[in-house]
């Protein structure tokens, strides 16, 4: 499970690339670095692919998330599939097509869950999947 910088690092590990600075590299009307807002605040909406771990977790294709990043996925790494994106097309989630426990999100559920308990389900799902592999 990768979160924010881990999301970006995981993509690079699988051969993907990043936009180094969203404001300079990509035209967008959406705020991706919500530095002036409380960190738990929902900053923008995302769409979730129905055929994804994230959809299994949230049971919804629409979700609002916080946002604290100035880098973003440009080219997706090999063996990864996009599972969530913001309205401007920036990737917000992906998962591996080859490794069932490799998945990642760009937002910060670890900050949001105190205010939005459904965000805790990301961690519950990760623990459940990991625990099932321990013998």
Regions found by a protein language model. Name each.
Residues 23-135:
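Amide-donor transfer/coupling interface in amidating biosynthetic enzymes
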Residues 1-37:
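Cysteine-nucleophile active-site neighborhood
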């Amino acid at each position: 499970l990768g979160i924010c910088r881990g999301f970006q690092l995981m993509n690079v590990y699988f051969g993907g690339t990043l936009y180094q600075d969203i404001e300079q590299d990509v035209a967008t009307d959406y705020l991706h670095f919500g530095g002036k807002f409380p960190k738990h605040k929902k900053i923008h909406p995302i769409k979730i692919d129905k055929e994804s771990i994230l959809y299994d977790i949230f049971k919804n294709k629409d979700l609002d998330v916080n946002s604290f990043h100035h880098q973003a996925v440009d080219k997706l790494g090999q063996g990864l599939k996009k599972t969530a994106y913001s309205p401007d097309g920036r990737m917000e989630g992906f998962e591996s097509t080859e490794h069932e426990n490799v998945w990642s999100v760009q937002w910060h559920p670890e900050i949001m869950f105190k205010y939005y308990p459904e965000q805790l389900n990301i961690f519950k799902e990760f623990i459940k999947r990991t625990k099932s592999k321990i013998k």
